[in-house]
């Protein structure tokens, strides 16, 4: 399934409400540009794990640095070949799957090994600490955990699934 948005604000809303595996965004968009969208996403614990590719017609070092510094996993200048974009998408998705596979094979590996960003690392440490502290609590529920993490149960599910491949 492919989701489309006419601007960065709509895209951010779509990403927060749907399960998304990858973002491909143009830099030049109305209301919220691609740099802002990427920065917002990479600083939002609910969606920071989603790989992000920025596309641009700007051919200068400052623009490229701005894109990568906003958190983009890849930055491609237009015009680009569809083969190159396909390879980039494949590599990002494959590395995410390898990370998930590694965790599935070694479920007791340090949770920090799942983090793809500092935001994810903080999230995973907080989640792990809470679970270790409350594991003996018979009343522990997904709702309590989501509340502690400051997100809805569906956002918590998407985040954990996105980072670990587990539900």
Regions found by a protein language model. Give the residues of each.
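Acidic, metal-coordinating helix/loop segments flanking the phosphotransfer/catalytic sites
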Residues: 4-22
């Amino acid at each position: 399934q492919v989701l489309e948005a006419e601007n960065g604000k709509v895209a951010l809303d779509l990403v927060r409400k749907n399960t998304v595996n990858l973002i491909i965004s143009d830099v030049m968009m109305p209301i919220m540009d691609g740099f802002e969208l990427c920065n917002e996403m990479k600083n939002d614990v609910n969606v920071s794990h989603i790989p992000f590719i920025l596309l641009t017609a700007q051919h200068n070092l400052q623009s490229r640095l701005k894109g990568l510094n906003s958190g983009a996993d890849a930055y491609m200048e237009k015009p680009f070949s569809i083969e190159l974009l396909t390879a980039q998408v494949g590599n990002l998705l494959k590395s995410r799957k390898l990370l998930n596979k590694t965790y599935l094979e070694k479920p007791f590996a340090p949770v920090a090994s799942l983090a793809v960003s500092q935001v994810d690392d903080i999230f995973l440490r907080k989640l792990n600490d809470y679970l270790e502290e409350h594991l003996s609590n018979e009343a522990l529920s997904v709702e309590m955990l989501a509340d502690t993490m400051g997100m809805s149960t569906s956002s918590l599910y998407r985040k954990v699934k996105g980072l670990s491949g587990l539900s």
